[in-house]
Amino acid sequence: MKDLHNREIKSLRISITPQCNLNCFYCHKEGHNIDNNKLMTPTEIGEMVKYSLKYGINKIKISGGEPLLRNDLPEIIRNIKNLKNNQIKDISLTTNGILLEKYAQKLKDAGLDRVNVSLDTLDPELYKKITGGNVELVKRGIEKAVEAGLKPIKINFVVMSNTVGGLNDIMDYCRKMGVILQIIEFMPVDEKLKKYHYDINKIEEEISKKSDKTMVRKFMQNRKKYLVDGLEIEFVRPMDNTEFCSHCTRIRLTYDGLLKPCLLRDDNLVDVLTPLRNGEDINKCFIKCIDRRELYFKE
């Protein structure tokens, strides 16, 4: 199905919990304050995905909070994988990696295809300062994900004024591990954080000079990919980027069952969990969400 601006809807991003085991100072805390009565069950998540298939969804991204805090995550993945008439080509997970060592093989066995791991620095002290966590746990989790056969594995590196100095180390690490590096523009959630913003155009300019090959991901906001000495690098720009909006093919579902037409807005959400629990037809909820998508983000 296409929205009113002729963009096909291909991807559903599901936040399954707002809880997290880290405390990153820049986090936008996707989702809402937790209410266990509203938390979607594995069965309900499966039902949501089943309905979404009618509208062309063929990719599922599971996120949080930290999704690995839900012990029933393998069940959630199996429920999605085992849907009848399943056209899902890709089930992926975004995680901070702290618990990945424990769950990587279980997730692969349940049907997970690939994983994105957040890693802003390899420096133990800086990592602890940014997140409050232990970077060695993340590295062990990435190793287990590689061993389990989850692929491609992508490392989400958020560029900030205090992390950009470690870019070369991150590149070397990703090359050694055989994983993809995503260089992500930092989105300040308030005025106090603007000092951490770093212009990634400078980085891309340098990377492009070293690149052996350049590609464009047409259905992912026309993102450019570079191949540098065997390392694949992508740039992700959510800020002031018309391509990010005009090529957006994704809708989002919060942990408490609200459909989000836009990543950056919370004023046009559609409640889909209440109608589902009341035994109502939720097709109209998906249609309403898709119809509320605008061509560009407006504040």
Curated annotation (Swiss-Prot):
Cofactor note: Binds 2 [4Fe-4S] clusters. Binds 1 [4Fe-4S] cluster coordinated with 3 cysteines and an exchangeable S-adenosyl-L-methionine and 1 [4Fe-4S] cluster coordinated with 3 cysteines and the GTP-derived substrate.
Cofactor(s) annotated in UniProt: [4Fe-4S] cluster
Chain positions recorded as S-adenosyl-L-methionine binding sites: Y26, G65, S118
Keyword set, alphabetical order: 4Fe-4S, GTP-binding, Iron, Iron-sulfur, Lyase, Metal-binding, Molybdenum cofactor biosynthesis, Nucleotide-binding, S-adenosyl-L-methionine
Domain (Radical SAM core) ranges: 4-229
UniProt keyword 4Fe-4S, yes or no: yes
InterPro entries linked: Aldolase_TIM, Elp3/MiaA/NifB-like_rSAM, MoaA_arc, MoaA_NifB_PqqE_Fe-S-bd_CS, MoaA_twitch, MoCo_biosynth_MoaA/MoaC, rSAM
SUPFAM superfamilies xref list: Radical SAM enzymes
Protein name: Probable GTP 3',8-cyclase
Species name: Methanococcus aeolicus (strain ATCC BAA-1280 / DSM 17508 / OCM 812 / Nankai-3)
Species classification: Archaea, Methanobacteriati, Methanobacteriota, Methanomada group, Methanococci
Gene: moaA
